[in-house]
Structure formats: C-alpha cells, structure tokens
C-alpha cells in the first residue's frame, strides 16, 4: 500500500510530541508523503498551543522539502452538546480542522452521549 498523506500529526508545539515542523516535513518527504497535515491541539489540552499560535500560521510556508503542508488544529469537543474549544474566527484561519474527544477536557459520557457530541460538533 502506498500512503500519500497523513493529516493528524503534532509537533512539539502540542506539548506531547518531540519534533519540529521542519523535522516532520523532512521525515514525511523521506517517507514519500505528498501531503502532511499538522494539527496541533487547541487550548483544552493542558500545555498546548495558545490561540496566538494558530492566528500566526499564515506566515508559515505551505511547502517544505517537496511536500505540501496543511496547517490546522485538533479541536477539542468539550461536552455532549458538541461545544468546541476554538471559536469560529480562529477556525477560519486554519487550512484543516479535525475534532476529537480527549478525557483531559471532556466529561466521559455514555456511547450515545459521546456520539451525540461528535455529531453536534460537525
């Protein structure tokens, strides 16, 4: 199988990864990726990026080492209502937005409640 993209990655800016953006792009290019999505955590995860980080992404090149980059966020779903920890103004500045439930900032619910939260977030 030939994998051409990875759209859910973190750099050291997320607080729990160990590579820089340039290191990630170089490694992706070496593996033959054509597209790499960098999706740092938003503020619901302790120790991660400040909103200013996302607002400044416009200065970062969208191509490095021959690989295209999409820069964005892994936005936290905070509850079963689908509340997100990023506002619309911030989200509009991103190339890519993914969302997830993380127990560090989400009160665990039933499968039905969690599913409802995911659907509401969409």
Name each model-derived stretch.
Residues 2-4, 35-36, 70:
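Hydrophobic "anchor" residues on beta-strands that sit immediately upstream
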Residues 4-15, 38-41:
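Histidine-centered catalytic micro-motifs
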Residues 8, 28, 40, 69, ...:
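Divalent metal-coordination and catalytic microenvironments
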Residues 15-19, 47-51:
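Histidine/acidic-residue-rich catalytic or RNA/ligand-binding cores of hydrolases
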Residues 16-20, 110-113:
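Glycine-rich anion/phosphate-binding loops
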Residues 22-36, 56-62:
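Alpha-helical scaffold segments that flank or form the walls of functional sites
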Residues 42-43, 76:
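Conserved beta-strand edge residues that scaffold enzyme active sites
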Residues 48-122:
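Extended substrate/RNA-proximal surfaces in nucleic-acid metabolism proteins
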